[in-house]
From Swiss-Prot:
One of its GO terms (cellular component) is nucleus. InterPro entries: Clp1, Clp1/Grc3, Clp1_C, Clp1_C_sf, Clp1_N, Clp1_N_sf, CLP1_P, P-loop_NTPase. The keyword Nucleus applies. Required for endonucleolytic cleavage during polyadenylation-dependent pre-mRNA 3'-end formation. Residues 411-422 have a biased composition (Acidic residues). GO terms for biological process: mRNA 3'-end processing; tRNA splicing, via endonucleolytic cleavage and ligation. Belongs to the Clp1 family. Clp1 subfamily. Pfam families: Clp1 (PF06807), CLP1_N (PF16573), CLP1_P (PF16575). Residues 1-25, 410-445 are annotated as: Disordered. This is mRNA cleavage and polyadenylation factor clp1. It is found in: Nucleus. Residues 9-24 have a biased composition (Low complexity). GO terms for molecular function: ATP binding; polynucleotide 5'-hydroxyl-kinase activity.
Amino acid sequence: MSLPGLELTQPSAESQSASAPPTQINLSAGSEWRFEVAFGTTVRVKLLTGTAELFGTELAPSQTYTFSGTKAAIYTWHGCTLEVSAGDAVSGLDGTTSASGRGGLGAGGCQSEYIAEETPMVEYANVHFALEGLRAEAKASGRDGPRVLILGPEDAGKTSLSKILTAYAVKVGREPIVVNLDPTEGMLSVPGTVSATAFRAMLDVEEGWGSSPMSGPSAVPVKLPLVYFYPIVNPLEAEGSVFRPIVSRLALSVMGRMAEDEDAKETGIIVDTPGILSQSRAGALEMINHIVTEFSITTILVIGSERLYSLMMKSYDNKPSSSASSAASDERISVVKLSKSGGCVDRDAAFMKAVRESQIRTYFFGNPVPTTASSALSISSSSTTNVTLSPHAQQLDFDAIALYNYTTSSAEEDQNDEDDYDPAQLTTDSFLPGNNEAESASSLPGLNSAANASAAAAAGALVPLKKVPGPAPSALANTLLAITHASPTSSPSEIRDASTMGFLYVADVDSERGKIRVLAPVGGRVPSRAIIWGKKWPAEVVGLVG
């Protein structure tokens, strides 16, 4: 269409929406292609020739992979050729494509992409082979396999290294147990959780760790995570009084799995940690020591911090491990320094917010990004499909649920928090076990019932967890609720230490009628269990439903 007087032609809608032709990228042996894709856009990658891997998981030849909201790198040991093209736009939580979701100027619409010749992959591979040697020794002597702790500052590549070591272990037939202690990102779960999973099958190239059991199809075998809810962004909050016992419960479950599963025992565990533990904060070193002790760590990998490496060397190198099976063999801790990859980039607050929203949306609605799941469903291998889930909506009487909320907060939040910490509310008999009756609490040897009741009340007061009274607070809207395995009348410590059954999303709150409308991943009545409110973390997720 011509513009009058200017003799210029306005581009048609078809020409504007036409995507650029695919770009071929040739990688030499030992190099990697680093790329960043914004949320709201997709980039398709196909391996044409050679071999390549993404965080240790090999790409299948001639298979199209779709990425969105990703910062990653594809590495090749022997050289390869990739085909990169722009994919379709993906709507956000509100059904629209955000301005930040426009494609970039790189190949296929990537925000940033380049080829790097210098990578730490040889170091990481050497770590894998060293761990394999330790696993072989453990099998021969009947001991537990290596227990690996990964430390480093924020955005140093700790999770990427965890994926690489896990993928390499699975590739040689091992069964590593991976532990995620970072509540800012969920592993096979939503943000605000810590979890552990035994990996028997390959990781998902497009979705990272893969997916937990769901009612929809999956191209990669699903994993079964053990999840604990920690709705606080800082593990050191309240001097670690909440995070520390959760770590202990998770470690107890992991060690129990290793005792019963011979494959997991021989392979060992890999523990990923939050970057805040590597900062010079009060309580950080104590928390690291707690993790080392509870998981009987034998190998500490430090990435991107000379100060932390020096501190770990002084504190742990060549010191005896706390493993029960190491008493006879005198197993000792090794501290190893690894190089930080040049591909590690800072993830700003806006990107991390989008990551959290994407994980929560995927939990309830499935993945909106077209994936390769169609090939697993015997559909045309050249096509892709969306894995769409339909959550079940239902109304709940607020007075009929046992909703609890953590009252720990930073000094800044204390000034504006309507739920200020009140120890008096934590010492009421409503937190005592046995249907709110102090008399039904189990007796302690050598103590009378009055002393036992006082001890139980004092123990409950130490846990910053209180029951949310009616009417239903409006702040519940657009937040997550975690259904625990604890009964509604359990003590605060029992609720804190209970693992999670699943999550609800509060779509609407009617305070006048005392009802809330929630989304659940499965149908049926909500179990009568203690429910924990994710008020402060992962906080509000607006626009999940219309």
